[in-house]
Amino acid sequence: MGIFSIANQHIRFAVKLASAIVLTLFVGFHFQLETPRWAVLTAAIVAAGPAFAAGGEPYAGAIRYRGMLRIIGTFIGCIAGLVIIIAMIRAPLLMILVCCIWAGFCTWISSLVRVENSYAWGLAGYTALIIVITIQPEPLLTPQFALERCSEIVVGIVCAIVADLIFSPRSIKQEVDRELDSLLVAQYQLMQLCIKHGEAEEVDKAWGNLVRRTTALEGMRSNLNMESSRWARANRRLKALNTLSLTLITQSCETYLIQNTRPELITETFREFFSTPVETAQDVHKQLKRLRRVIAWTGERETPVTIYSWAGAATRYLLIKRGVISNTKISATEEEILQGEPVVKAESAERHHAMVNFWRTTISCVLGTLFWLWTGWTSGSGAMVMIAVVTSLAMRLPNPRMVGIDFIYGTLAALPLGLLYFLVIIPNTQQSMLLLCLSLAVLGFFLGIEVQKRRLGSMGALASTINIIVLDNPMKFEFSLFLDSALGQIVGCVLAFTVILLVRDKSRDRTGRVLLNQFVSAAISAMTTNVVRRKENHLPALYQQLFLLMNKFPGDLPKFRLALTMIIAHQRLRDAPVPINDDLSAFHRQMRRTADKVISARSDDKRRKYFSQLLEELEIYQEKLRIWHAPPQVTEPVKRLSGMLHKYQHALTSS
């Protein structure tokens, strides 16, 4: 595809974006809004943001959800701005510095919460700064200004949602149905590969792809949930399917690992059975029927526990999958599966990374303030706003540097584009609302095409161009103000990018170590006699952490294998029949405390000390298990876990 070509699949969203901009512009001028530019800018960002992230037209519900987040973030930011102004109106410099800290605080929170919800916190950070900077000449108008901003943001979001609904947004339901069938086939093929005990690299690639696909399916579930309330039953089922898919991966990989030491456990009966190739979900369905008959004939005791558990999970997967596709009423059998176990949320391992983001945002905003006060530049306030916007939005993404570059390219492209609109197009169309709307529709259409291609600078160009052209009520064509605004955007983006480069994020290795120690802690916590704790479902949280590890360290197979081994150990120990007595219960609590100390240790020396203590406690625990005559289902997993921790002691304790 050429650089200027237009693909058919990109046209509908481009028209949708153009319609959102035109509708917002018309409503803004019709109802005499003070600054229609804010409403138009909001509509463009809310509509184009999900398209840029998806690399095409977003699915139904994505624009609506982003709009709701923007409303929430705007209201939080406006309230924070009002509180800061009321408390510190007599000390303007202190007031701006507190706003810089507030922007950093919101970035810190946005780095810790779910990525989908982080947008609201990033927006809350720079909204307060916008209000404080804008009301400097007339602080008494603060409540009116905050109210106007909130109302214009809401107008822009409503118009974007209306445009989305008019052009019949894509439903993700068919994609979900297809992925469920494809995922089931891939799960069966992984089990075939593990029973065949193929090459380790091939198995690693297979289970790694399945982890990514299961995570992607969870993202699809979130989209489906946003799409419509009629998918509520499908949403409940998909939550259960996420756990079942992860269970299938775990059981398959444990089957592979068992054969490293005890290949005789997998009998020829099962090797021959799993040698039959499958191509479709129907093939898997037929094979599962046969497998259940084989297990009934062989007997539960003669069937490896991993294959027995895998067959049960695959059967439940099939049952729930049919319910998702048909979206029928949940049956009693399904309800029993869905009620299952309470899911434990993952604890963030990126606290140090979040603190780095806090300092990046705060320092860049403070530097912007000093630059503004030192130069006295009339558009220094605009530069400050861009600094806050870039740092608040860039920090929550995997590659902040590329986001900074995107904004720089976008603001540079916005200068000639904005100049064309400011000097030629808008002055010649302001007498006709129709011509004005058409001129902005053309801008939205072509930039909408580029946004879907994820062209570098396209998103920044769309927002920056709308921000600098005259869309106020009434319109004022002062070239010096236009030039100041355009240059302020560029300078702000360059300063923000400079801070991103200078304040380096060296938290990657620390995050990796924390993640690995969290896997160890999860495996240790599975050794318990507490019935409630044993029923907790840690699997989604553990695989979420594994997915983060895979993104942080692409291609680092030893780390992935260690993490997967810890997950397998957790699942095996969770189901192990640990003898119930006060002595073991007290020792379980002691080991959990030691594992928590390993995670929270601030220095390598303390971490090594607590880790050595944990290894010693595991040796004592194994002796206690022998004294209390624990069965092999308990002693063998504990012995394997102890061996793994001894083997990877250096990787788990060194920064």
Curated annotation (Swiss-Prot):
It comes from the Bacteria. Keywords: Cell inner membrane, Cell membrane, Membrane, Transmembrane, Transmembrane helix, Transport. The keyword Nucleotidyltransferase does not apply. It is a multi-pass membrane protein. It is found in: Cell inner membrane. InterPro entries: PHBA_efflux_AaeB/fusaric-R, PHBA_efflux_pump_AaeB. PANTHER family: MULTIDRUG RESISTANCE PROTEIN MDTO, P-HYDROXYBENZOIC ACID EFFLUX PUMP SUBUNIT-RELATED. The keyword Transit peptide does not apply. This is p-hydroxybenzoic acid efflux pump subunit AaeB. One of its GO terms (cellular component) is plasma membrane. Induction: Positively coregulated with aaeA and aaeX by AaeR. GO terms for molecular function: transmembrane transporter activity. Forms an efflux pump with AaeA. Could function as a metabolic relief valve, allowing to eliminate certain compounds when they accumulate to high levels in the cell. The chain crosses the membrane at residues 13-33, 38-58, 69-89, 93-113, 121-141, 152-172, 370-390, 407-427, 431-451, 481-501. The gene is aaeB. Belongs to the aromatic acid exporter ArAE (TC 2.A.85) family. GO terms for biological process: carboxylic acid transport.
